[in-house]
């Protein structure tokens, strides 16, 4: 069977969806060799980074602002996404051995975390736009209660967006092994396949990039009125870094997903092209997954105050256990750390929440 953009592995040996059966054994063999170690690396680095953000926000910052709430939910989204990777790694190397219920559970967690991460990146972008461009209005709406309400709504939307994957994905025996993959109704196969692909492209690429372009354009216009050229340049570099990183990590996957779904339209409905697209899907999807490893860096650790919290957390909970008499453990107050940017110009908001 062919790839539907719903699970991050390739479980087939032959594709019967073409005019003649297409051998996919090489694709499966490559996936079995490369995907498990790659998924493992993404899991390790992503889990450590996002767990650090989670622990610092809970134990140190105490969720005092809308930005803190969105950062916490972004970390939770990434953690949900990452927790499924060990199971997909095992699936890529072998077959699905965890049963039908767990197939649906892990598919649901994967996509809820996936869409949740995207939606909270969008919320963080809009939040920064309001804080910098419409500062007076932001003082009224950027409350903790508002952050909680919008987060609950965002999770509901993420669950709703993931429902087709949860409903249609199931585990069943195909040939000599069990798979965990989407199975659309035969009479509506092409509709659901196209719908799923267009949904992924719109929600994971077009929508976030559109929001980033609009919001960051307004932020840049405001920052260019800043008198401190050095601080302004740093903020501008950070903004462009966020957009470029997101574009580079997710655009290849969405392009390959479109080409794979509409192979006949693009004249790629032959066995050779299908195999190459499958291999490209493996590479680009893994590349996109690594973006969740960068989220803690580009959305949290760029802030000087957040790095101060990280330093205090590290000294208090990690190194102190091995060196109780070291003078380095004198308690610092992160709230007294100077920010990179001042609130009067709005650059502080860029450094702590972009």
UniProtKB/Swiss-Prot annotation:
Modification(s) after translation: Sulfated on at least 2 of the N-terminal tyrosines. Sulfation is required for efficient binding of the chemokines, CCL3 and CCL4.
Modified-residue entries (Sulfotyrosine), positions: 10, 12, 16
Pfam families in UniProt: 7tm_1
GO terms under biological process: apoptotic process; calcium-mediated signaling; cell-cell signaling; cellular response to lipopolysaccharide; chemotaxis; defense response; immune response; inflammatory response
Any GO MF annotation of the entry: C-C chemokine binding
Disulfide bonds: 22-271, 103-180
Predominant place of localization: membrane
PROSITE patterns: G_PROTEIN_RECEP_F1_1 (PS00237), G_PROTEIN_RECEP_F1_2 (PS50262)
Residues bearing carbohydrate: 6
Residues in the Extracellular compartment per record: 1-32, 92-104, 169-200, 263-279
Functional summary from the UniProt entry: Receptor for a number of inflammatory CC-chemokines including CCL3/MIP-1-alpha, CCL4/MIP-1-beta and RANTES and subsequently transduces a signal by increasing the intracellular calcium ion level. May play a role in the control of granulocytic lineage proliferation or differentiation. Participates in T-lymphocyte migration to the infection site by acting as a chemotactic receptor.
Protein family: Belongs to the G-protein coupled receptor 1 family.
Protein name stated in the entry: C-C chemokine receptor type 5
Organism of derivation: Mus musculus (Mouse)
Record lineage: Eukaryota, Metazoa, Chordata, Craniata, Vertebrata
């Amino acid at each position: 069977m062919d790839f539907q953009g719903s699970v991050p592995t390739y479980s087939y040996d032959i594709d019967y969806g073409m005019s003649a059966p297409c051998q996919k054994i090489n694709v499966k063999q490559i996936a079995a060799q490369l995907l498990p170690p790659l998924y493992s690396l993404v899991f390790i680095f992503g889990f450590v980074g996002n767990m650090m953000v989670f622990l610092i926000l809970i134990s140190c910052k105490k969720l005092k602002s809308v930005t803190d709430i969105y950062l916490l939910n972004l970390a939770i989204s990434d953690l949900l996404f990452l927790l499924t990777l060990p199971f997909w790694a095992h699936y890529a190397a072998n077959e699905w051995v965890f049963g039908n219920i767990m197939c649906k559970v892990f598919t649901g967690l994967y996509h809820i975390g996936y869409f949740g991460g995207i939606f909270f990146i969008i919320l963080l972008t809009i939040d920064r736009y309001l804080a910098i461009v419409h500062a007076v209005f932001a003082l009224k709406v950027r409350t903790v209660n508002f952050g909680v309400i919008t987060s609950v709504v965002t999770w509901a939307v993420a669950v709703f967006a993931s429902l087709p994957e949860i409903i249609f994905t199931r585990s069943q025996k195909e040939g000599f092994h069990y798979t965990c993959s989407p199975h659309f109704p035969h009479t509506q196969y092409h509709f659901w396949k196209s719908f799923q692909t267009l949904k992924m492209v719109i929600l994971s690429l077009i929508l976030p990039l559109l929001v980033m372009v609009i919001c960051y354009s307004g932020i840049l216009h405001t920052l260019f009125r800043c008198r401190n050229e050095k601080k302004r340049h740093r903020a501008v570099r950070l903004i462009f870094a966020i957009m470029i990183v997101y574009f580079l990590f997710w655009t290849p996957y969405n392009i390959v997903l479109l080409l794979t779904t509409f192979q006949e339209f693009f004249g790629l409905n032959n066995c050779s092209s299908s195999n190459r697209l499958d291999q490209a899907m493996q590479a680009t999807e893994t590349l996109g997954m690594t973006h969740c490893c960068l989220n803690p860096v580009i959305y949290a650790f760029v802030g000087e105050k957040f790095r101060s919290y990280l330093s205090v957390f590290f000294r208090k909970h990690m190194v102190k256990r091995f060196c109780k008499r070291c003078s380095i453990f004198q308690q610092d107050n992160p709230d007294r750390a100077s920010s990179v940017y001042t609130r009067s110009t709005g650059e502080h908001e860029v450094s702590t929440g972009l």
